[in-house]
Each structure stands twice: as structure tokens, then as C-alpha cells.
């Protein structure tokens, strides 16, 4: 059966790797990059363990360690490179030939009807020649509960060249597997299936296609679209079913790929579709802006964006078809991977030596969880894929700028050092250490937020400093839970018709909160047994009082700003989604 599948499978022509992407003596370069990573890790560890103090002031109980200084410099460098990249992109006006064919693929699973309608409408009005653009929606599910998505597709694209098909299986399951609900272990497509022939015929002859197939996860849905397209299109654009595209999103990404043949993939600026649903969704909207316009912009400066986001990304199809089978059949610790689809796609492009870029000139709005539990499940799912893909990405560091190695090491060790710092200070027998820890966290957060305010030109980014508490109390413990459950998979938060019932991520949060409360209680207990009449303790009490007052005033100010500005003003003005080309310069809440 495998021989037959291999014989009938369409083998795409390998585009090859351009000579200017290949490094001479790759073994030597590997050794250089890995040695740099080891030295970097050793340097960070030594700076942390030795607790070498750069600046101390006993009168104000202040100290700045070498590790803290290094992390501050890292943020400064990241911010600088992000600014340079954004400025370069804004000053460059790339041409578009409008000759390249694009397949806009949408992955859907039990989507909220309102979000799906937004998505399909925006896809319909994308400004790109119709004879060069193909729209494909693949639905993960073929039951009556999933039929509403196909009906909506028919309604939106009524009058266009539409083709639909309800598939009893998918590329990796036959009719027999569909009936008993089992999951096959083979990773090769079943080319003799009649459904495959129908699907590929529809995709290659119709402009707008909707396929309902047996449930198999998001990766199976994306595979169906990619495999059915084959080599008939130049570029493949990815989009989620909860995403509203800017009308020029496709054009702007095509421009980037046309401008540089060494660029294998490009991503755009993803914003939040529902920022004012809750505090969680609002903070996610600020975090998204930072993630794309600072972190990804910095990576783009060095041509090594680590993840092309699923809601808004574009790949060269000839490259994608080369690693399509390997991407779908990815295994980790003997288990097939169903998480991290977008990150692994990006890593596959990077593994071939191609560049990955980010452009803020195209934008999309995507739904984000507004409930804490669903948001936590989403973050846990993303963290699992991050740690797994980090190991894969490390194999190809030597093919790219050394910044990718540096940033990978820093981001990997950061949670562990933060955890150790928090525990060490909480159990250091003095409540001043607790207050100083809280002040340091917020001071660094405010500095980063002030930079974001300047870069975005919007003071609302000052509220981004509140995200540090979400990180410390929620994301940090979830990272350890993600590592322990790294092989557990599923759609996670992607289905929006059902309430998330996975409460397991709450367990590490409970343990972490117990550790934090225990540390605070221990510090208070130890301080209660100290002699506060001594001059040293009187000085500490003085700083403790003013530290607590400053910290309290900060939270009062931020809460007031959030309540008045966001809950009252911005929420009333933001009744519709504003896209990139609809934003007037005078608008306050960008």
C-alpha cells in the first residue's frame, strides 16, 4: 500500500537551496554557534550565581546585579533593532506585479458564526486580482454540527465560482477508519480514496472551495488545503476562521516575497478582534502589539522571524510542498505532533536556510480568549509547541544570523532564572526583599511600556506594564506544566462553540500561589522576630513604608486609567473593527 501511495503521490520539484544561503564547512559553523550558545548560557549562569553587584547603595537599600544589567541591555538592543526595522519598512515602498497566484487557505473548527462571517467577508473583499486568488476553507468535522460553516461559506461567496464537498474521511483516513472513529498510524496519504480525487479536482478547478472532512486536528486541515493545491499556485496564505483580514493584507505580503527570492515566508501584524470583552482580552491586545511590533520586528531585522502567525502569514508554495509530508508526520518522543503547526512550518522554512520576515504594513484582527481559563489553556498550548520547536530550531542556528542563537538562549533560560529569583527573594527572611522584588518587576515593566508608548504613539500602551503580573502569576507556572505535559495534544482553544473544560492548568497555578504565599508568610514571620528598634531596622522600615505606598499608588493609578479610559471611553468608541487603511491619524485608541 505504501509503494502504491508513493507511486501515485505527486512529487513536487525541489526548488533547491540558493547557493548564497549555503554556508561552507557547515560542521565548523555548527561548532561555532553551539560554542557561542554554551558560553552565553555559562555567562548568564555565572552572572546570576555569583550575584556580582554593579551598583549598590546601602542608604537606600538598593543594588543592581550583573544579571539585571544584562537583561536590561537585552531589552534595549531588542527595542533598538525593532525600531530600525519598522522605520526601514515604513520608508520602503515595494512594488507588486500582481502576476503571482495566491491560495488563501482558512482552517476552521466549530467557529463562532459571527467571527466566521467576519473572516469570510474580509476574504471576499481582499484587493487582489480574482483570477490570481483562490480561497479555500477546510472544516475539521463533517457532522451536522459543522454544516453551518459550509452554509455560511456558500452564502458569502454566492455568485462566485464555488465548489463544496463533504468528505467522509481525510487524506490519512479511509472510510473504514471513519466509521469506527479510530485514528490511523500511517502518515502517508491514501491516494486511492475517491474523496481525494474529488477534493483535488475541486481545489484546482474552482476559485472558492469549502471542504468538510473527518475530524483530524488543525494540522490535518491545513495539510488538506496544501496537498490539494499541489504545485498549481505560487504562494500560499494561511488564515484562521476567526480572523478578519485587512483588504491589502495579501498584496503587502506578496510584495515582500517578490522583493527577495531568498525570503521563504512573511507574516503580518495581528491585532485583537475583541479587545474590550474583558481585562484578559484587553491585556492580550497590548501583548500582541508588543509581540509583533517589537519582538518579531527585531527578529525580522535579522531575517529570522521565529514564528509566522497562523492568522496572517504567507509561504512560497514550492518550498512548502518540499517539506509538506515531513511537516505533517512530525513526531516528538514517538508521538505525532498536533500542536505548533505554524511554528513548525516556520522552522521548516528556516531549516532550508530561507529568510523569514515581518511586515507591519498588512494587518489582521483575530479573536482571543476573554475568559481566564481559556486564555490559560491557549498559553499552555503555545508554550508546549515553543519548547518542542526550540529543540528543532537549534539544529539550524548556524544557517542564520547569530542573533537567532542569542535570542533563543535568552528566551529559554529566562523563566528558570525568574523562578529562582522569586523563590530566593521570598524566602530571604525579610519583607523588604518582597517589596523590592515587586517594585523591580513593575519598574522594568513601566520602562518597557514607556518605550512602547513612544514607538506606537499611543499612551494606552502604558497599561502594558500590568501584564507582568499576569506573567508572574499565570504564565510562569504554566510553562512548567507545559513541559511536563508536552506530548498531550488537541485543538485547545480553537473551538469557540464549546466551553473549555480543561481545568488541569489550574493545578500548577495553585501550587505556585502556595509557594508565593508561603514565601511572603515566611518573610513576615521572620521579620516579626526581629528587633525593629535598631538604626538599620528603622532605615529598612522607612524604605518599606515608602515602597509599599509607591507600589499601591501605581496600582491605583493603573486601575483608574483602565477603568476610565478603556472601560468607559475606548469601549464606547470601538463598536466596529478598524483595519489598517481605515485608521485616521487623529484617533486616540489605535
Curated annotation (Swiss-Prot):
Cofactor: Mg(2+)
Superkingdom: Eukaryota
Reactions catalysed according to its record: [hyaluronan](n) + UDP-N-acetyl-alpha-D-glucosamine = N-acetyl-beta-D-glucosaminyl-(1->4)-[hyaluronan](n) + UDP + H(+); N-acetyl-beta-D-glucosaminyl-(1->4)-[hyaluronan](n) + UDP-alpha-D-glucuronate = [hyaluronan](n+1) + UDP + H(+)
Principal subcellular localisation of the protein: membrane
Annotated signal sequence range: none
Keywords: Glycosyltransferase, Membrane, Transferase, Transmembrane, Transmembrane helix
Membrane topology type: Multi-pass membrane protein
InterPro entries reported in the protein's UniProt record: Nucleotide-diphossugar_trans
Extracellular topological segments: 53-60, 423-425, 478-505, 565-588
Subcellular location: Membrane
Cytoplasmic-side positions: 1-31, 82-401, 447-456, 527-543
Pathway membership: Glycan biosynthesis; hyaluronan biosynthesis
GO molecular function list: hyaluronan synthase activity
EC number per UniProt: 2.4.1.212
Any one GO CC term of the record: membrane
GO terms, biological process: extracellular matrix assembly; hyaluronan biosynthetic process; polysaccharide biosynthetic process
General function of this protein: Catalyzes the addition of GlcNAc or GlcUA monosaccharides to the nascent hyaluronan polymer. Therefore, it is essential to hyaluronan synthesis a major component of most extracellular matrices that has a structural role in tissues architectures and regulates cell adhesion, migration and differentiation. Also able to catalyze the synthesis of chito-oligosaccharide depending on the substrate.
Family listed: Belongs to the NodC/HAS family.
Protein name in UniProt: Hyaluronan synthase 1
Organism: Xenopus tropicalis (Western clawed frog)
Gene assigned in the entry: has1
Amino acid at each position: 500500500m505504501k509503494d502504491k501511495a508513493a507511486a501515485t503521490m505527486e512529487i513536487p520539484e525541489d526548488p533547491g537551496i540558493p547557493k548564497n544561503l549555503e554556508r561552507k564547512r557547515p560542521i565548523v559553523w555548527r561548532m561555532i554557534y553551539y560554542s557561542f550558545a554554551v558560553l552565553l548560557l555559562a555567562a548568564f549562569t555565572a552572572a546570576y550565581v555569583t550575584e556580582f553587584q554593579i551598583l549598590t547603595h546601602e542608604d537606600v537599600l538598593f543594588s543592581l546585579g550583573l544579571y539585571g544589567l544584562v537583561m536590561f541591555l537585552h531589552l534595549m538592543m531588542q527595542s533598538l533593532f525593532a525600531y530600525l526595522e519598522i522605520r526601514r519598512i515604513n520608508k520602503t515602498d515595494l512594488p507588486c506585479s500582481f502576476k503571482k497566484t495566491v491560495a488563501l487557505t482558512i482552517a476552521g473548527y466549530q467557529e463562532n458564526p459571527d467571527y466566521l462571517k467576519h473572516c469570510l467577508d474580509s476574504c471576499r473583499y481582499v484587493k487582489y486580482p480574482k483570477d490570481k486568488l483562490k480561497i479555500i476553507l477546510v472544516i475539521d468535522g463533517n457532522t451536522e454540527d459543522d454544516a453551518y460553516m459550509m452554509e455560511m461559506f456558500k452564502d458569502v461567496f454566492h455568485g462566485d465560482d464555488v465548489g463544496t464537498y463533504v468528505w467522509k474521511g481525510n487524506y490519512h483516513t479511509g472510510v473504514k477508519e471513519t466509521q469506527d472513529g479510530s485514528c490511523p498510524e500511517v502518515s502517508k496519504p491514501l491516494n486511492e480514496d475517491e474523496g481525494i480525487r474529488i477534493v483535488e479536482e475541486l481545489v484546482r478547478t474552482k476559485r472558492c472551495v469549502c471542504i468538510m472532512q473527518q475530524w483530524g486536528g488543525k494540522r490535518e486541515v491545513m495539510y488538506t488545503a496544501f496537498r490539494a493545491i499541489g504545485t498549481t499556485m505560487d504562494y500560499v496564505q494561511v488564515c484562521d476562521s476567526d480572523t478578519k483580514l485587512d483588504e491589502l493584507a495579501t498584496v503587502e505580503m506578496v510584495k515582500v516575497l517578490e522583493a527577495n527570492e531568498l525570503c521563504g515566508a512573511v507574516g503580518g501584524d495581528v491585532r485583537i478582534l475583541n479587545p474590550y470583552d474583558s481585562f484578559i482580552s484587553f491585556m492580550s491586545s497590548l501583548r500582541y502589539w508588543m509581540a509583533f511590533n517589537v519582538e518579531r520586528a527585531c527578529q525580522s531585522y535579522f531575517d529570522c522571524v521565529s514564528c509566522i502567525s497562523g492568522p496572517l502569514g504567507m509561504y512560497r508554495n514550492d518550498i512548502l510542498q518540499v517539506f509538506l509530508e515531513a511537516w505533517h508526520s512530525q513526531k516528538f518522543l514517538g508521538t505525532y505532533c498536533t500542536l505548533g503547526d505554524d511554528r513548525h512550518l516556520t522552522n521548516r522554512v528556516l531549516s532550508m536556510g530561507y529568510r523569514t520576515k515581518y511586515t507591519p504594513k498588512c494587518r489582521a484582527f483575530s479573536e482571543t480568549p476573554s475568559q481566564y481559563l481559556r486564555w490559560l489553556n491557549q498559553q499552555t498550548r503555545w508554550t508546549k509547541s515553543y519548547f518542542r520547536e526550540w529543540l528543532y530550531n537549534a539544529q539550524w542556528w548556524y544557517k542564520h544570523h547569530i542573533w537567532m542563537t542569542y535570542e533563543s538562549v535568552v528566551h529559554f533560560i529566562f523563566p528558570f532564572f525568574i523562578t529562582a529569583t522569586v523563590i530566593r527573594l521570598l524566602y530571604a527572611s525579610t519583607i523588604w526583599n518582597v517589596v523590592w522584588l515587586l517594585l523591580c518587576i513593575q519598574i522594568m515593566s513601566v520602562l518597557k511600556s514607556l518605550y512602547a508608548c513612544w514607538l506606537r504613539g499611543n499612551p494606552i500602551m502604558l497599561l502594558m506594564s500590568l501584564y507582568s503580573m499576569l506573567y508572574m502569576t499565570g504564565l510562569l507556572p504554566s510553562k512548567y506544566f507545559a513541559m511536563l505535559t508536552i506530548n498531550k495534544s488537541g485543538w485547545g482553544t480553537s473551538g469557540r462553540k464549546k466551553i473549555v473544560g480543561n481545568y488541569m492548568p489550574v493545578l500548577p497555578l495553585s501550587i505556585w500561589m502556595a509557594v508565593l504565599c508561603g514565601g511572603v508568610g515566611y518573610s513576615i514571620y521572620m521579620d516579626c522576630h526581629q528587633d525593629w528598634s535598631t538604626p538599620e531596622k528603622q532605615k529598612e522600615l522607612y524604605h518599606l513604608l515608602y515602597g509599599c505606598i509607591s507600589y499601591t499608588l501605581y496600582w491605583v493609578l493603573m486601575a483608574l486609567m483602565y477603568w476610565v479610559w478603556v472601560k468607559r471611553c475606548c469601549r464606547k468608541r470601538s463598536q466596529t473593527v478598524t483595519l489598517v487603511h481605515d485608521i485616521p491619524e487623529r484617533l486616540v485608541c489605535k
